[in-house]
Amino acid sequence: MPNLANIDNPYEDQEQEAFVKWLDDNGYPRFRVPNETYTKSHKQRLKNKKLGVSSGVPDLAVVVPNTGTRRVYVETLDSDDSADYDQPISRLVFIEMKRRKGGVTSTNQKKWIKTLNEAGIQTVVCKGCDEAIEFIKSITK
């Protein structure tokens, strides 16, 4: 993890690397869709588009445990194996990382953030690793 304490305004990828390290160290499953749209090859850009690459998709998806459970009944063909149990509730949140100072959210990023939030998937912009950590802590209290 890069030491960001001595850097006035780390790059976005440095902030994200530090945040991913914190997520891993604290047991939060996460993933990043490799969704970069830049490439010199016109052929590759066309292929990327056909494969679903979309400009503006948030940087990280994080699985966050919630504090509750829900009662689930699982019925099997063999009724002796049927059971109900408490299933922990988790949720998926998306985070768009930006630099502490000067990071700008693009029009396409704003559209994705709005679309995901309207679909009930909490999506936020965090300026720096510390803000992202505080966001995760705030929704897991």
Predicted regions and their residues:
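Catalytic phosphate/metal-binding cores of nucleic-acid and nucleotide-processing enzymes, i.e., regions
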Residues: 1-141
